Amino acid sequence: MVLKTELCRFSGQKIYPGRGIRFIRSDSQVFLFLNSKCKRYFHNKLKPSKLCWTAMYRKQHKKDAAQEAVKRRRRATKKPYSRSIVGATLEVIQKKRAEKPEVRDAAREAALREIKERIKKTKDEKKAKKVEYASKQQKSQVKGNIPKSAAPKAAKMGGGGGRR
C-alpha cells in the first residue's frame, strides 16, 4: 500500500495522511504545516532558512551531502544519443568534433580577442563621457558652493539573530 505524503510548507518534512494543519490564506493560497510549531513560526514570519532543523537550512548549508551525491550519480547515467541541435545540423556538429584542436584554439582566441577589443572600446567611450561630464560639472559649480558631507548613520537596533 502506498501512502500519499505531502511536504510541510515551512519545514519541508513529509506529512503523512491524518497529520498536519491546513491553513488557507485570504488570497486562497493553501499551506500545509507538519505541526503547530511550524504553523506558529510561519505566522511569526520566521525564515525557515535560519532555523537549523528545517530542510531549507540543511540544503543551504550542504548538510545532506551524501544524499545529494547519490541523486547526482543516478541522474548522471543517461544513454547517449546523437541528434541535431536547433541551428546546427548533425553534419556540422560532427565536422566541428573532427576538427583539430589547434584550429579550434585559434578560432577561440580570435573570438576572445574580438570580444576584448569590443569591451575596451566601450570602456574608453565611458571614460570619455565621464571626463566630459566632470568638466561640465566643474564649470557649472560656483566657488562658494561646497557639497555637504553625508550625515553619520545611526546605530542599528535589534538583536544579532543567532540560533532559535
Swiss-Prot record:
Q: Specify residue ranges for compositional bias: Basic and acidic residues.
A: 117-133
Q: Which GO terms describe its cellular component?
A: cytosolic large ribosomal subunit; endoplasmic reticulum
Indicate yes or no for the key word RNA-binding: no
MF terms (GO), sorted A to Z: mRNA binding; structural constituent of ribosome
Q: Which InterPro entries match?
A: L24e/L24_sf, Ribosomal_eL24, Ribosomal_eL24-rel_N, Ribosomal_eL24_CS, TRASH_dom
Its domain of life reads Eukaryota
Tell me which UniProt keywords the record has, alphabetically.
Ribonucleoprotein, Ribosomal protein
Annotated region Disordered: the residues are: 117-164
**Subunit comment for this entry?**
Interacts with the cauliflower mosaic virus transactivator TAV to form a TAV/60S complex. Interacts with REIL1 AND REIL2.
What family does the database annotate?
Answer: Belongs to the eukaryotic ribosomal protein eL24 family.
Report the protein's function.
Might have an extraribosomal function in reinitiation of translation.
User: What's the protein called, per UniProt?
Assistant: Large ribosomal subunit protein eL24z
Q: Which organism is it from?
A: Arabidopsis thaliana (Mouse-ear cress)
